[in-house]
C-alpha cells in the first residue's frame, strides 16, 4: 500500500485560505469612543514656515546623500556595473553569453544537427 511520488494523503490545514476562502477571518478592530478620537486628532499649533522648511530639503542637501561617483537621476535608477571586466573587452576564451532567442537560431548546430 505504497503511495506514488507526488501523491498526497489529503487533509491538512492550508495557509492559502486567502486564495480559497479558508474559513477563518481576522477579528474586527474595536472602535474607539468618538470623544477620545477627537482629542487625539487635534494637533498642537505649528508654524507653517518651520514645517515647509523641514519637509523639502534643498538641492545641496539632496546631493550630499548621493555617494561620490554615482551619477543618477530619479527616473533612471538601475544599477550598471562599471569595472574592468564589464562592457567590451578582449579575452582569450569564447563568450558564454547566449546570442540567440529561445526557439530561434543557434550556434549549437554541432549538438542538434545544424542546418
Swiss-Prot record:
The keyword Transcription does not apply. It comes from the Eukaryota. GO terms for biological process: cortical microtubule organization. Keywords: Microtubule. Residues 29-48 are annotated as: Disordered. The keyword Secreted does not apply. GO terms for cellular component: cortical microtubule, transverse to long axis. InterPro entries: SPR1/2/3/4/5. Transmembrane segments: none annotated. PANTHER family: PROTEIN SPIRAL1-LIKE 1 (PTHR33403:SF31), SPR1 (PTHR33403). Belongs to the SPIRAL1 family. Acts in maintaining the cortical microtubules organization essential for anisotropic cell growth. This is Protein SPIRAL1-like 2.
Amino acid at each position: 500500500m505504497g503511495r506514488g511520488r507526488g501523491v498526497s494523503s489529503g487533509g491538512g490545514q492550508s495557509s492559502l485560505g486567502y486564495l480559497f476562502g479558508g474559513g477563518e477571518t481576522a477579528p474586527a478592530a474595536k472602535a474607539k469612543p468618538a470623544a477620545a478620537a477627537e482629542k487625539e486628532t487635534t494637533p498642537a499649533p505649528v508654524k507653517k514656515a518651520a514645517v515647509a522648511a523641514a519637509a523639502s530639503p534643498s538641492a545641496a542637501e539632496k546631493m550630499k546623500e548621493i555617494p561620490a561617483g554615482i551619477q543618477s537621476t530619479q527616473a533612471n535608477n538601475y544599477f550598471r556595473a562599471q569595472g574592468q571586466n564589464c562592457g567590451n573587452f578582449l579575452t582569450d576564451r569564447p563568450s558564454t553569453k547566449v546570442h540567440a532567442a529561445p526557439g530561434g537560431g543557434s550556434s549549437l548546430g554541432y549538438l542538434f544537427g545544424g542546418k
